[in-house]
Amino acid sequence: MDVFMKGLSKAKEGVVAAAEKTKQGVAEAAGKTKEGVLYVGSKTKEGVVHGVTTVAEKTKEQVTNVGEAVVTGVTAVAQKTVEGAGSIAAATGFGKKDQLGKNEEGAPQEGILEDMPVDPDNEAYEMPSEEGYQDYEPEA
């Protein structure tokens, strides 16, 4: 029976040693897993931040391009409107077509939109000065 007890004791020591190694192995594996997860998480976060920044920059560029196109379009529409009004005025006899759109010296008049400061990189636009406007007093 003594041999039997000695054998069980050796088996117990082996199980304890294996359990310790397993516990140490599991703890080490858990530590490595945690490091790996944190590394992947940080790289993913960096990637997301970079991606969001890139999208924001591209969006800003597109808004700037659209803003420039809108200003160009508005200027073109205003110019065509002035030309159309000049043609109507000439056709109805309110003025000579070659004199419409010119100031007293005979030079072409500048439109209000041309005087408007536009900075596509800046989101703030200023209103044109009131010097470009003329007072209108209807005849009685």
UniProtKB/Swiss-Prot annotation:
The entry sums up its family as follows: Belongs to the synuclein family.
Purpose: Neuronal protein that plays several roles in synaptic activity such as regulation of synaptic vesicle trafficking and subsequent neurotransmitter release. Participates as a monomer in synaptic vesicle exocytosis by enhancing vesicle priming, fusion and dilation of exocytotic fusion pores. Mechanistically, acts by increasing local Ca(2+) release from microdomains which is essential for the enhancement of ATP-induced exocytosis.
Question: PANTHER family annotated for this entry?
Answer: ALPHA-SYNUCLEIN, SYNUCLEIN
> Gene encoding this chain?
SNCA
Q: Which of the residues bear the PTM Phosphotyrosine? A: Y125
Q: How is it modified after translation?
A: Phosphorylated, predominantly on serine residues. Acetylation at Met-1 seems to be important for proper folding and native oligomeric structure.
| Record-listed Phosphoserine modification sites | S87, S129
What's in the keyword line of the UniProt record? Answer: Acetylation, Cell projection, Copper, Cytoplasm, Membrane, Metal-binding, Nucleus, Phosphoprotein, Repeat, Secreted, Synapse, Ubl conjugation
Provide the binding site for Cu cation. Answer: D2, H50
Gene3D superfamilies cross-referenced by the UniProt entry: Helix hairpin bin
- State the Gene Ontology BP annotations: chemical synaptic transmission; regulation of dopamine secretion; synapse organization; synaptic vesicle endocytosis
User: Where N-acetylmethionine occurs, residue numbers?
Assistant: M1
Pfam families hit by this protein: Synuclein (PF01387)
Q: How does it assemble?
A: Soluble monomer. Homotetramer. A dynamic intracellular population of tetramers and monomers coexists normally and the tetramer plays an essential role in maintaining homeostasis. Interacts with UCHL1. Interacts with phospholipase D and histones. Interacts (via N-terminus) with synphilin-1/SNCAIP; this interaction promotes formation of SNCA inclusions in the cytoplasm. Interacts with CALM1. Interacts with STXBP1; this interaction controls SNCA self-replicating aggregation. Interacts with SNARE components VAMP2 and SNAP25; these interactions allows SNARE complex assembly and integrity.
Q: Which organism is it from?
A: Sus scrofa
Q: Recorded GO terms, molecular function?
A: copper ion binding; cuprous ion binding; identical protein binding
Q: List all membrane-crossing ranges.
A: none
Which intervals carry biased composition (Acidic residues)? 112-140
Write out the ranges of the annotated region (Disordered): 98-140
Cell location: Cytoplasm; Membrane; Nucleus; Synapse
Q: Where is this region: Interaction with SERF1A?
A: 111-140
Give the CC-aspect GO terms.
Answer: axon terminus; cytoplasm; cytosol; extracellular space; membrane; neuronal cell body; nucleus
What name goes with this protein? Answer: Alpha-synuclein
